[in-house]
Regions:
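Membrane-embedded alpha-helical hairpins and interfacial helices in multi-pass inner-membrane proteins
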Residues: 41, 117-191
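Aromatic-anchored segments of alpha-helical transmembrane domains
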Residues: 19-27, 75-83, 122-131
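Short, charged juxtamembrane terminal tails flanking transmembrane helices
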Residues: 1-4, 190-200
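Membrane-interface helix-boundary motifs at transmembrane edges
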Residues: 3-7, 62-64, 104-114, 193
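Hydrophobic transmembrane alpha-helices
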Residues: 2-71
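Interfacial aromatic-anchored transmembrane helix boundaries in multi-pass membrane proteins
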Residues: 30-35, 75-103
């Protein structure tokens, strides 16, 4: 699909709908993984980035315009505000801007390598959802966690994993790798299915 700068109503609707799909995937994975502390703390973000990668690549390729990623990240930040984590909105806006810089060159929205670079960076930085509370907003997060019904054992596990250098390094590497692998799957799906079906 040819990349242009002019947005249509259809582009806006498609961006919002696919952003909603991405957010639903993220929320569902998070809820399912909360059944086990290890899976929730260590693996869930990586699983999320892997599953979301093909949808993200489809969305950006389908729209073929700048600011798609920024819009998605902004919507994600608004969802976190509604969940009580106001500090994640400016953070995800910054993540969106970084991804837009990676995709800024004309034609990047149709280049798998550029899309992979953008989503891999987003995957690494998505860990801010767990790191920012510990580093800067612990009181806000702790009050939110208790108010939302989280058990103290869950909060203790969260602190243990995200303050251990070894576990933190593993989580960051795992999440980044899973985002990258998800893009490999997404590139294959786009090449073998979406383009042939006329979606792109």
């Amino acid at each position: 699909m040819k990349e242009t700068n002019k947005w249509s109503v259809r582009d806006v609707i498609t961006t919002v709908l696919l952003s909603a799909v991405l957010i639903v995937i993220q929320l569902v994975v998070n809820m399912v993984c909360m059944a086990n502390d290890f899976v929730s703390m260590v693996l869930s973000v990586g699983i999320t980035m892997f599953l979301c990668a093909p949808v993200y690549m489809l969305m950006v390729s389908r729209i073929g315009k700048r600011f798609v990623t920024l819009i998605y990240m902004t919507i994600l930040g608004v969802i976190f505000i509604l969940m009580g984590n106001w500090f994640l909105l400016p953070y995800y806006v910054l993540v969106g801007i970084l991804c837009e810089l990676i995709l800024w060159k004309e034609g990047s929205c149709q280049k798998p390598k550029r899309l992979t670079a953008a989503w891999t960076a987003a995957s690494l930085l998505y860990n801010g959802v767990n790191l920012l509370p510990i580093w800067f907003f612990w009181d806000t997060y702790y009050d939110f966690a208790l108010a939302s019904g989280m058990e103290q054992s869950y909060i203790d596990s969260y602190v243990r994993y995200y303050t251990s250098p070894g576990w933190l390094a593993f989580i960051l590497l795992f999440t980044t790798l899973m985002g990258f692998l998800g893009c490999m799957v997404g590139s294959r799906l786009i090449r073998r299915h979406f383009k042939k079906a006329g979606v792109l």
